């Protein structure tokens, strides 16, 4: 499930900065996306003051100077156009991204929402492309109503802290509004995220040394590993998803792999996860996805081993299923299963190749 022509003001002295050496410290305030694109390399601190990004353009913050700080002030908005985006793209090393008190990034996704997401209808822009944003941090952003996917992460040593993505206005027509999609990344930490959306709160398609903790996920598809298989990188290793709540969502926690494809999911921990009002599956592991949907027939190409479900507890709606495990023969192994207590839904009679220690009837 997977992302500038006028005013430029130098904040400190009121004059536009000259070309900067790595040792120079210059603070720049931009009020247009075009000025930011042309002037970003001259600034060690970049402030966006109520910036309105024109329709069909990306707020281009790629190739920032090492050590740059980016601050969003006021309300950041985007013009309407049917296009793929992203609305914001950022890359660089040792970049600090934060938001001033009271500021917000308003994508106004309702202009694109048509109930089809990225599967048809209007072409919708993805929100934030964090590719090659390495050894960096994003803190405190408040983001509203992404048209489709939120953060596309392909980075090393990126920490995202206390970010809110509020797509709650899209309950009716929002679709594919994944909050955090991670691929080909290492040492990613997402701490304290608050998400209201209509798709995965977290989706890890590949990567290693990834932590998601202290999260709150409301309205979407839950906390997901996958789908795994069919990409250039099909390995997920050393992931911890912990101390989080998933409410009013389709799934609680899940691992899904692609029918007939190969890959590896290993050393994944789901710990201290609280579920509430889950409509489909509390815990789900499926090795049968094809063309985005389950087939009911698992295949053996992806191994799912050294998986921990510890203190995953809470409620599923009566129309849903507490736990569903559908593994290929011998492909799910060495699982740790403790303190799991998911209730309220049905007990599945269709589980297959459940590894020792796990259970579809807990």
UniProtKB/Swiss-Prot annotation:
Entry's transmembrane regions: none
Residues carrying covalently attached carbohydrate according to the record: 334
Coiled-coil stretches noted in the UniProt entry, renumbered to this chain: none
Active site (catalytic residues): 199 (proton donor), 221
Reactions this protein catalyses: (1,4-alpha-D-galacturonosyl)n+m + H2O = (1,4-alpha-D-galacturonosyl)n + (1,4-alpha-D-galacturonosyl)m
PbH1 repeats: 155-184, 185-206, 207-227, 236-257, 265-287, 299-344
Xref: InterPro entries: Glyco_hydro_28 (IPR000743), Glycosyl_hydrlase_28 (IPR050434), PbH1 (IPR006626), Pectin_lyas_fold (IPR012334), Pectin_lyase_fold/virulence (IPR011050)
GO biological process, one term: cell wall organization
Top-level EC class as recorded in UniProt: hydrolase
Function: Involved in maceration and soft-rotting of plant tissue. Hydrolyzes the 1,4-alpha glycosidic bonds of de-esterified pectate in the smooth region of the plant cell wall.
Family: Belongs to the glycosyl hydrolase 28 family.
Name this polypeptide is given: Probable endopolygalacturonase B
Lineage: Eukaryota, Fungi, Dikarya, Ascomycota, Pezizomycotina
Gene: pgaB
């Amino acid at each position: 499930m997977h992302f500038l022509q006028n005013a430029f003001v130098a904040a400190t002295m009121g004059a536009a900065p000259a070309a900067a050496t790595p040792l120079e410290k210059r603070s720049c305030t931009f009020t247009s996306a075009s000025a930011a694109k042309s002037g970003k390399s001259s600034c060690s601190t970049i402030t966006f003051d109520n910036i309105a990004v024109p329709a069909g353009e990306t707020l281009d913050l790629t190739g920032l100077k090492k050590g740059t700080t980016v601050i969003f002030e006021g309300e950041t908005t985007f013009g309407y156009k049917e296009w793929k985006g992203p609305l914001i793209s950022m890359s660089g090393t040792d970049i600090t991204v934060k938001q001033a008190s009271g500021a917000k990034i308003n994508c106004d996704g309702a202009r694109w929402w048509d109930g089809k997401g990225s599967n048809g209808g209007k072409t919708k822009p993805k929100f934030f492309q964090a590719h090659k944003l390495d050894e960096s941090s994003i803190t405190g952003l408040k983001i509203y109503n992404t048209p489709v996917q939120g953060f596309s992460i392909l980075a090393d040593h990126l920490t995202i802290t206390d970010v809110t993505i509020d797509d709650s206005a899209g309950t009716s027509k929002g679709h594919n509004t994944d909050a955090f999609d991670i691929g080909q990344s290492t040492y990613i930490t997402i701490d304290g995220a608050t998400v209201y959306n209509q798709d995965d709160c977290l989706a890890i398609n590949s990567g290693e040394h990834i932590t998601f903790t202290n999260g709150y996920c409301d309205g979407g598809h839950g906390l997901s590993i996958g789908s795994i298989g069919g990409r250039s990188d099909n390995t997920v290793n050393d992931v911890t998803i912990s101390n989080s709540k998933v409410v009013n969502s389709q799934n609680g926690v899940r691992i899904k792999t692609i029918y007939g494809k190969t890959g590896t999911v290993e050393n994944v921990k789901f710990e201290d996860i609280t579920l509430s009002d889950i409509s489909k599956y509390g815990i789900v592991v499926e090795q049968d996805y094809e063309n985005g949907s389950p087939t009911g027939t698992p295949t053996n190409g992806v191994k799912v081993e050294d998986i921990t479900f510890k203190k995953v507890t809470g409620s599923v709606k009566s129309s849903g299923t507490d736990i569903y495990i559908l593994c290929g023969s011998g492909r799910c192994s060495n699982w740790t299963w403790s303190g799991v207590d998911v209730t309220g839904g049905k007990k599945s009679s269709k589980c297959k190749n459940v590894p020792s220690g796990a259970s579809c009837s807990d």
